[in-house]
Amino acid sequence: MSIVVGQAYQHLPKQVSQNPDVGGWSFLQYFSEPKGIVQNREDDTKKTAYVYPIEKRSVAKLSLEMCTESLGTENGSDSGDEMSLLALEATNISKSPRLTTKPQKETSFMTRENSFPPPLNSVNGFNNSRMVKSYKEDGRLVVQAIRVCSPPRCFVSERREGRLRLCLSQNSLNSQDAEEEFEEEDEDDQYDAEEEEEEEEEEEEEEEEEEEEEEEEEEEDEEGIVGNNENFEGKSGNKKVSNRPKRRCNENGCEPKTMLNWKQQQFWVTT
């Protein structure tokens, strides 16, 4: 009897392991195993996982690309690997966020135009300062270096009793006096030129007046004289009097007195 009972107990654990859902002790034994716990968790995550529709579309695109790759390899083209790489790069680039690049401002450089003629090193080497003068001669441009004296000092600084004093230099005073004299000479020259112009205008007016007077005298002579240089008789008697006025030149704008005292008279003509 003891042998039969022992054999029965030996069969019990095998049945429990094969049928874990039978009885309350089998339920505890099932959860005590780590493999069963992990499998249950994986099953739960697979059932509860949610897939976004955007990801589904991307998966569909990948499947289409894979199909085209397989078709290309079947046709015998060698560009299947290259196409797959390009497709993967395209998907990676599309997923990566685009960086906004700011437009770079165009920097414009201003070119400074130097004055003509350019500075010469040989001219700068001398002690006396020089200037360059340009002029045209026979249709050519001539550049000439001219010596220029150094500008005079206007102020002279001196230190006395811990103070700095500024005094006008003698050169500056002399230069100011020379400038004043030069200005006075210019004014005198302008005044003299104006006087000469006025005198010339007066002389021209006098000459015009003299010409007009001479024309009037000639007209009067033509009216009072008839014939070729004949003697005329006056009212006083049979005396022959030549009452023809004498013509004189006007010198220095002075009119002859005889012409002023002469009066028009009536004459009898004899034939």
UniProtKB/Swiss-Prot annotation:
The organs and tissues expressing this protein are described as: Expressed in the shoot apex, stamens, anthers and young siliques. Detected in provascular and vascular tissue.
Region Disordered, annotated ranges: 174-255
* InterPro entries in the cross-refs: FAF, FAF_dom
Q: Spans of biased composition, class Basic residues? A: 237-247
Entry superkingdom = Eukaryota
Q: Where is the signal peptide?
A: none
Q: Which Pfam families does the entry link to?
A: FAF (PF11250)
All residue ranges annotated as the FAF domain in the record: 114-168
Which ranges are annotated Acidic residues under compositional bias? 177-224
| Family of the protein in this entry | Belongs to the fantastic four family.
Q: What does this protein do?
A: Able to repress WUS when constitutively overexpressed, but have no effect on CLV3.
Q: What is this protein called?
A: Protein FANTASTIC FOUR 1
- UniProt organism field: Arabidopsis thaliana (Mouse-ear cress)
